[in-house]
C-alpha cells in the first residue's frame, strides 16, 4: 500500500468503524454530525463526534500535509468525559516502511483540574481504546 492511499483511507474512514467498540468506560463513537463536505479537505473543518453514552465533542482539523500527516483538536467536550478532559490534540503521520507504510498516531490530552489526578488511570484506558482502534484500522489497511 502506498503512503498516499494509507493517508486517504485513515483520513476518511468513518469514525464509528474504528471506534465502534466500548473499551471499559470509554464509550464507542456512534455517529459524526455537522460535517460539511468530504472530511480532510480544509484546515478549520469541523464535525461533532457523538458517543453511545450521550457524550459529544467537537473535532477541528488543524493540519493537512498530504500525504504525510494530518492533525486535529478536540474541544467542547460534553458528557462524562467533560469531568476529566478539557481538550486534546492529535496527529496522524504516514511514512514508507519497507514495502508498506508506517502509520503513527500521537495525542496530547489536556485534563481538567479534577481530571489531572485521574490521568494515570485515564491514560491506561485511553491507550487500550487507541490500541483497539489501531487494530480495526489495520484490518482496513490490509491490501
Regions found by a protein language model. Give the residues of each.
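A short, structured loop/turn motif at beta-sheet edges
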Residues: 1-4, 62-69, 93-104, 139-143
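Hydrophobic ligand-binding cavity/cleft-lining segments
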Residues: 1-39
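Short, highly charged C-terminal tails/helix-capping segments
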Residues: 27, 31, 135-143
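A generic structural signal for short beta-strands and their flanking turns/coil linkers
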Residues: 43-45, 55-57, 66-70, 88-90
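Short beta-strand segments that buttress and anchor functional surface loops
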Residues: 44-52, 72-79
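Short hydrophobic/aromatic-rich beta-strand segments that constitute the beta-sheet cores
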Residues: 49, 59, 69-74, 103-105
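Short acidic/polar mixed-charge low-complexity motifs
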Residues: 53-55, 99
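Beta-strand/loop substructures that line and gate deep hydrophobic ligand-binding cavities in soluble
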Residues: 74-128
